[in-house]
Amino acid sequence: MSKTLYQKIYDSHIVYEDKKNISVLYIDLHLIHEVTSPQAFDSLRNKKRKVRQPEKTFATMDHNVSTQKRDINASGSMAKKQMQQLIRNCDEFNISLYDINNPNQGIVHVIAPEKGMTLPGMIIVCGDSHTSTHGAFGALSFGIGTSEVEHVLATQTLKQQCFKNMKVEIVGDIPKFVTAKDIILFIIRRLGSSGGSGYVIEFCGNVIEKMSMEERMTVCNMAIEMGAKSGIIAPDETTYAYLKNKIYSPSGACWEXSISYWKTLKSDKDAFFDKCFTIDISNLAPQVTWGTSPDQVISINEKIPHYNEFNSITQKNSAKSALKYMGLNEGAYLTNISIDKVFIGSCTNARIEDLRSASKILKNRKISSNVKAIVVPGSGSVKQQAEREGLDKIFINSGFEWRLPGCSMCLGMNRDQLNIGERCASXSNRNFEGRQGRGGRT
């Protein structure tokens, strides 16, 4: 029987399947952080359970950490408590932790790929919605809730249903100045914020084949913004080259055996997909969101739409509400709207290639004195590499602040936030109301 890539990975991890097609799946890698794990560990203690496979569990601090100084007190009492609990939990249950004093600390979805923890064919889970990032490697990866975090810690398995398959083929020649972020924003605009609901989306096509691993991670990272369970891309030579010689990657004879297996991880030619889309990006311009949903997107040279231009009542009401919250008028150009802050960072766009691209634009230029701008590398390793290349100096000389790794302004959960009414041009993944701080406009 022909299978999609998703079906191959799903089926190979079934431990038990009931008559209602609900499966117990084996989990290869469990990523945890300070926010969604404390209650799970408390429940383990109360039930006198152990972590079943601590060697397949990895932790870091990222959501709450200060990006200005390495001080556990710097983000407030709640953040301090959560970080202290993570240290205690990892020590008690023998889990590897990159805490704020570890030079490699950073965003969990940046660290795992760059260290070679993320491998093709794995099932990877984390108490974070953007776990779909790891799908760029041909892994099945998705976010889970706190009760599920406890279940995986205790059993190294998870109960799941099989989702539908969607194929999004991206074709054409990538125009100048268009990035992977532009491409995925355009796809979200086309398919809608719920267009992927109930599906695992496989991205393919000549555009994907030309992308670097970091670009593919950006695409899969934002599959969740279409409502998808996850996004996934079949591994290829680009994948293997990226993983070779990483700290946690296979080596020696194991490397060759792994390559042989990874080459089987692709959808069969006649595999069935429940939905298929082909999207040509040859004429695409840079994309930017104007509203409060990731599908409220326009090209940089387009006018902000009128809410009556949308088809459904729900879309009209959403657009009307977004225009009011954002303080924007239909028919205006976003290029004429002033901004207060700029954020370069997040698990979507805080890798070394992202920083290189931004630094090229900023070299020998100065930002407005009225704008506060920060760059937050995705990990200690990214920060160190950027500094070796002198990128930090380019950012600082242009007027940006060069920060320490963390989730930072992607979410209003630390000291990096917008004030009420402030506008931010952000490289992150969500533009919800209050996402970057109460009353902030992303």
Swiss-Prot record:
It comes from the Bacteria. It holds the Pfam family Aconitase. Keywords: 4Fe-4S, Amino-acid biosynthesis, Branched-chain amino acid biosynthesis, Iron, Iron-sulfur, Leucine biosynthesis, Lyase, Metal-binding, Plasmid. Its cofactor is [4Fe-4S] cluster. Pathway: Amino-acid biosynthesis; L-leucine biosynthesis; L-leucine from 3-methyl-2-oxobutanoate: step 2/4. The keyword Nucleus does not apply. Binds 1 [4Fe-4S] cluster per subunit. GO terms for biological process: L-leucine biosynthetic process. Gene3D superfamilies: Aconitase, domain 3. Its EC number is 4.2.1.33. It catalyses: (2R,3S)-3-isopropylmalate = (2S)-2-isopropylmalate. One of its GO terms (molecular function) is 4 iron, 4 sulfur cluster binding. [4Fe-4S] cluster binds at residues 347, 407, 410. It is an enzyme of class 4 (lyase). Belongs to the aconitase/IPM isomerase family. LeuC type 1 subfamily. Heterodimer of LeuC and LeuD. Catalyzes the isomerization between 2-isopropylmalate and 3-isopropylmalate, via the formation of 2-isopropylmaleate. This is 3-isopropylmalate dehydratase large subunit. It comes from Buchnera aphidicola subsp. Uroleucon helianthicola. The lineage of its organism: Bacteria, Pseudomonadati, Pseudomonadota, Gammaproteobacteria, Enterobacterales. The gene is leuC.
